Amino acid sequence: MFRRSEKFSTDKTAQELRTKVLPLDQLARTIESVRKSGQRVVLCHGVFDLLHVGHLRHLKAARAFGDLLVVTITGDDFVNKGPGRPAFPSMLRAEMLAELEVVDFVSVVEEASAHPSIRAVKPDFFVKGNEYADPKKDISGKIVTERELVESFGGQLVFTEDITFSSSNLLNRYFNVHDQSAREYLADLRQTDFESQFNRTLDRIEKMRIVVVGETIIDRYVYVDAMGKAAKENIIATLYRDEEVFAGGVIAVANNLAAVCPNVELVTMIGDPAAGDNQEDLIRKNLAPSVDATFVYRPSGPTVQKTRFVEPTYVRKLFEIYHMDDTALPRNVQDSFRGLLSDKLAQADLVVVCDFGHGMIDAGTVDLLQKEAAFLAVNVQSNAGNIGYNLIDKYSRCDFMCVDAMEARLAVRDKHAGLPDIVTRRLPDLVDCRNFIVTHGRSGCYVRKGDGAVCIPSFGGAVVDTVGAGDAFFALSAPCVAAGADCEMAGFVGNVAGAIKIGIVGHRRYLSRFEIQRYVSTLLK
């Protein structure tokens, strides 16, 4: 089955190659030369993260369709199976495949689909496992476009029928991908039909009309290298390297909501164009195309900006500067804002409020939201700019509330309070709400379920950047509850969103429905 040498013999062209693993452009030239001899070329594509007997049988069956078998694998940065995947880097996966006698060539594709490899190889047969035979069961939707592309080159999409294993299932069962609490929780969840329930919930969310309200925040990352203590001052000197500017705050929430719902309206506050660059062009450029935005302009004030000075190697924040005017909006601006907000609330199935405490949402706006929202989901944030002044009890009622542990403890004025007691008793005493979730970083989240609390463990891998993780959690959990799911499902999905987000620097990209579904599916295998 396995060979010690990478040298092999199929024809003259192949004998001249020094290795089976080729860059995609070189593979294309090699296959073009091979095809001239009349050989039929077969292509398989996948992640092949943990090579197993199911893969071997699939590859042997694929080889039977032609004379030459090419296997392409998805590059590490494009594997959408959740944090911690792939378990093995692309070159190790490629090396393992190349050692199989049945495989003639291997290449790594730096894209999330098989399209580049299909274009390069132009296979006579593109072979997939029988789990892809029904296009409706392919949550990525790629099998349809891949079939069309293969057929455009005169090839044919075919399926193998044999024993089926899952690399994700094997990794989950036999490798310590998650800690003990997560493994036990997932083992119980696998005994239910959670995944199908979740997919039905997504289908309901897709039909909703969602209005998002909150402040836009510009997140600026200034990358610097620490040089050491300044000679004459008690400060650390740094060397400027680069910077990135992201549209964050409520923009991130709206964009993440747009991943699961095409009907998202946004009402947000930004700075006065007359007062300088209010970053409106950047904001509009970064909004998801399906998000319909309405801007409220703060007279004479800037768009809220948080500049973080960051050590780039490990994305460690050194210090932060706020640029903002967080005083209450002038009466005429507030009245105009409430008028347009009232019109939008009347048409919304779900109203998502991201209250960052920077002056947009006052008591009058809270009253309007509580009276007119059909389903009100609220996140009231405590941050360095408002600590102690923006607590959840500014809302007397809502339908779903999501805060982190510090925000919950501030609200109940007890820094040592147990989170289960906060979720089940103390928060409901403050706010008339049936659905509470309190997030707790690596410890997961606590959700109110019946008269008790359930702890849902976190699933994240290595933490790259925590900025926006709570917003991603809220953006996915809120519509789940509004669509009829219980808080346990909402908390699970929120943890999935947060786990994906902590692997992304700033807001370089937002979540997609496909990666959320794929990660849920991966966890439950």
Regions found by a protein language model. Give the residues of each.
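Nucleotidyltransferase catalytic core that binds NTPs
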Residues: 1-190, 525
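Histidine-anchored nucleotide/phosphate-binding helix
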Residues: 52-68, 245-260, 365
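Short internal beta-strands
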Residues: 68-74, 129-130, 265-270, 376-380, ...
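Glycine-rich phosphate/adenosyl-contacting loop at the front of the ribokinase-like
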Residues: 185-265, 457, 461-464
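Substrate-binding N-lobe of the ribokinase-like
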Residues: 235-304, 519-521
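Conserved phosphate-binding/catalytic loop of the ribokinase/pfkB sugar-kinase fold
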Residues: 295-301, 306-345
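Conserved phosphate/ATP/ADP-binding segment of small-molecule kinases
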Residues: 350, 363-453
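Conserved post-catalytic alpha-helical subdomain immediately downstream of the catalytic base
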Residues: 432-435, 459-523
